[in-house]
Amino acid sequence: MTKEAVIEVRGLCNRFGAQSVHENLDLDLYRGEVLGVVGGSGTGKSVLLRSIVGLRTPNEGSVNVFGQTLLELDEHQRSLIERRFGVLYQRGALFSSLTVTENIALPLIEHAKLSRASAERLARVKLALVGLPCLTGDKYPSELSGGMVKRAALARALALEPDILFLDEPTAGLDPIGAADFDQLILTLRDALGLSVFLVTHDLDTLYTICDRIAVLSQKRVLVADTLEKVAATDDQWIQHYFHGPRGRAAKQAADNAPRRA
């Protein structure tokens, strides 16, 4: 069966002055998959994410989403596409002056044009969806633990019921138990909501636990994008060190010993 690509990146080039980060980069995200994007420092993982979601205009190349080329759409058409994105930034990016409920309600008021009361009722539903108690909604971001901030930001990313969820280092700063719980939450939401997930990470446990495919950024392009087993077998120095070094071996052993998902 042919896989449906919900995102198609072709010939992407990103430059900052004389420095080139991406050259002729190609990558697909298939419907329903969790795609992990990895690479060494400076390979432009977050730049790629920003280029796809419309926060950065690439110097060259195209980004097609649901069969439409973003750069060719007018502002209204592009807005309709981007409403189908949910984005979780590395540090949550919650507004410090708003309560958690107000943070989640904001896109519902701004984009879905709900009343404040309706938006805040729906925000409480989103809180429950990510495993946070209702009382969390009355708190400010500064009153939350790191794990709670991640979940609150995830609830906001899910506010408009997106088709594609973008995650930028979602387990960064979490302890191992919190990171494992967050990984399982992503899988549960993917299956329950029919999400496609674009996941930038350096967390080997996440790669082994929840990713269907892995894309490795290297040499200014996607060096390989395939299943973990095939990626780990690629004859490349960085890949071999990353997947077969001490941390990689530990992550593989933990995954091998974990109960299999149904």
Where would I find each of the regions flagged by the language model?
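Conserved ABC ATPase signature
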Residues: 140-144, 148
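Catalytic Walker B motif of ABC-type/P-loop ATPase nucleotide-binding domains
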Residues: 165-168
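Helix-to-loop junction immediately C-terminal to a conserved catalytic motif
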Residues: 53
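Conserved ABC ATPase "signature" region
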Residues: 69, 117-135
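Conserved catalytic motifs of ABC-family nucleotide-binding domains
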Residues: 161
